[in-house]
């Protein structure tokens, strides 16, 4: 049965145009073609990425955070309380008013004390500012290097300037070492993101992030073994062109450099809109939807690839909506911050705020820093 499933999955009619077989993509005459077995290396490489990330965050990102004066807000810990802890772990982190009244009677605390305990307990579970900074630093470093390397891989190729050449001779298109390593490294990195997503900072778009990582892994993998490599390199470079800007904006936001953060964010928003909502759908998707049909009849692989591209495009539209919301806040005089962030709650008691080192007393906090409006910002 397993052999039958294997044979059906790798049936040429699913993944290749009519009258072509996998034998046509076997290495010959010094020409090397993409093969599914090439992708096996990406799993150990993903584990290597996790190891490199650990040491990068420890020996590069942490000193950089200190250099940029990334400071933690002192958090008041919730005192031990078995009754409230049991409710927090089993019933929810946001008790309703009726729950607060019941817990007040069970614990012998006032309703206000119960609410304060849950605020502190939720804050304990939120990631620290240093953790956020280190994570953003790692992603910034990778995306910047990947964008530079990816651009170097494609900038001298004829299909970079004429998209019809993406399909010239398809699928009998040999690959070169730079394409191989670009693919393996990108795919390995996204595997590492998927492996670490449970321990990384969780944002409001957590489910969308999982969908994005899975869709990206499927797209990169399929485009490799079906030899959509030329289109794949264009798509990966296009995606990397804006991601490093977002991560750098986050880094400066966590460091409290609001002017720098806002300026980089505006650049990111422009690049994101142009690349994800203009170039990708009207050039790249047009290239993958229209041009192949001029060469051969549509087949399953054609539909599958473009369906997954459609999934990514829907995510781009969703994220563009969040970006435009943040841009609107910036234009209307509110500090830009990541709409996906899980914001830390503040204590309502003045005495507690003072005990926490209330230099930011009576001022709202975002990411552990007092929010600075456009009329009073930290100088860059």
From Swiss-Prot:
Write the record's keywords in alphabetical order, separated by commas.
Answer: Acetylation, Endoplasmic reticulum, Glycoprotein, Lipid biosynthesis, Lipid metabolism, Membrane, Phosphoprotein, Transferase, Transmembrane, Transmembrane helix
Disordered: annotated span: 338-380
Span-the-membrane segments of this chain are 41-61, 140-160, 181-201, 209-229, 264-284, 304-324
Q: Which residues form the TLC domain?
A: 131-332
User: Topology: which residues are Cytoplasmic?
Assistant: 325-380
The annotated modulation of its activity is:
Ceramide synthase activity is inhibited by sphingosine-1-phosphate.
Question: PTM Phosphothreonine: at which residues?
Answer: 346
Q: Where is this motif: Last loop motif?
A: 291-300
Please report the PTM annotation for this entry.
Acetylated. Deacetylation by SIRT3 increases enzyme activity and promotes mitochondrial ceramide accumulation. Phosphorylated at the C-terminus by CK2, leading to increase the ceramide synthase activity.
State a GO cellular component annotated for this protein.
endoplasmic reticulum membrane
Q: Which domain of life is it from?
A: Eukaryota
Q: Which pathway does UniProt place it in?
A: Lipid metabolism; sphingolipid metabolism
Entry membrane topology: Multi-pass membrane protein
Its biological purpose is as follows: Ceramide synthase that catalyzes the transfer of the acyl chain from acyl-CoA to a sphingoid base, with high selectivity toward very-long-chain fatty acyl-CoA (chain length C22-C27). N-acylates sphinganine and sphingosine bases to form dihydroceramides and ceramides in de novo synthesis and salvage pathways, respectively. Plays a non-redundant role in the synthesis of ceramides with very-long-chain fatty acids in kidney, liver and brain. Regulates the abundance of myelin-specific sphingolipids galactosylceramide and sulfatide that affects myelin sheath architecture and motor neuron functions.
Subunit (UniProt): Interacts with ATP6V0C, ASGR1, ASGR2 and SLC22A1/OCT1. Interacts with ELOV1, HSD17B12 and TECR. Interacts with NDUFS2.
What's the protein here called? Answer: Ceramide synthase 2
Q: Which organism is it from?
A: Bos taurus
Q: Which gene encodes it?
A: CERS2
């Amino acid at each position: 049965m397993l052999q039958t499933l294997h044979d059906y999955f790798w049936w040429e009619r699913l993944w290749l145009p009519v009258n072509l077989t996998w034998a046509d993509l076997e290495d010959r005459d010094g020409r090397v073609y993409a093969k599914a077995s090439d992708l096996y290396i990406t799993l150990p490489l993903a584990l290597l990425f996790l190891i490199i990330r650990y040491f990068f965050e420890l020996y590069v990102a942490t000193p950089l955070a200190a250099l940029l004066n990334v400071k933690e807000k002192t958090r008041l810990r919730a005192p031990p309380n078995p009754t409230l802890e049991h409710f927090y772990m089993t019933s929810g982190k946001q008790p309703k008013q009726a729950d607060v009244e019941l817990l007040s009677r069970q614990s012998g605390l006032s309703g206000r004390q119960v609410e304060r305990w849950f605020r502190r307990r939720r804050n304990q579970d939120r990631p620290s500012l240093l953790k956020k900074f280190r994570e953003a630093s790692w992603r910034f470093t990778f995306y910047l290097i990947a964008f530079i390397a990816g651009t170097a891989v494609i900038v001298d190729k004829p299909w970079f300037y004429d998209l019809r050449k993406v399909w010239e001779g398809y699928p009998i298109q040999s690959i070169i070492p730079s394409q191989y390593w670009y693919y393996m490294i990108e795919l390995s990195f996204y595997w590492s993101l998927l492996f670490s997503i449970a321990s990384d900072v969780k944002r409001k778009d957590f489910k969308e992030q999982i969908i994005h990582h899975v869709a990206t892994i499927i797209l990169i993998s399929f485009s490799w073994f079906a030899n959509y490599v030329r289109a794949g390199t264009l798509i990966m470079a296009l995606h990397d062109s804006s991601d490093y800007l977002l991560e750098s904006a986050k880094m400066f936001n966590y460091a409290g450099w609001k002017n720098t953060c806002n300026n980089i964010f505006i650049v990111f928003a422009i690049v994101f809109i142009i690349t994800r909502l203009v170039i990708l759908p009207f050039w790249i998707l047009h290239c993958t939807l229209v041009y192949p049909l001029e060469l051969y009849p549509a087949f399953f692989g054609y539909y599958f690839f473009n369906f997954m591209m459609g999934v990514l495009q829907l995510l781009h539209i969703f994220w563009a909506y969040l970006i435009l919301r943040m841009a609107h806040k910036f234009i209307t005089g509110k500090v830009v911050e990541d709409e996906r962030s899980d914001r830390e709650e503040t204590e309502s008691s003045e005495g507690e705020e003072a005990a926490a080192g209330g230099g930011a007393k009576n001022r709202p906090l975002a990411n552990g820093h007092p929010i600075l409006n456009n009329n009073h910002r930290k100088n860059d």
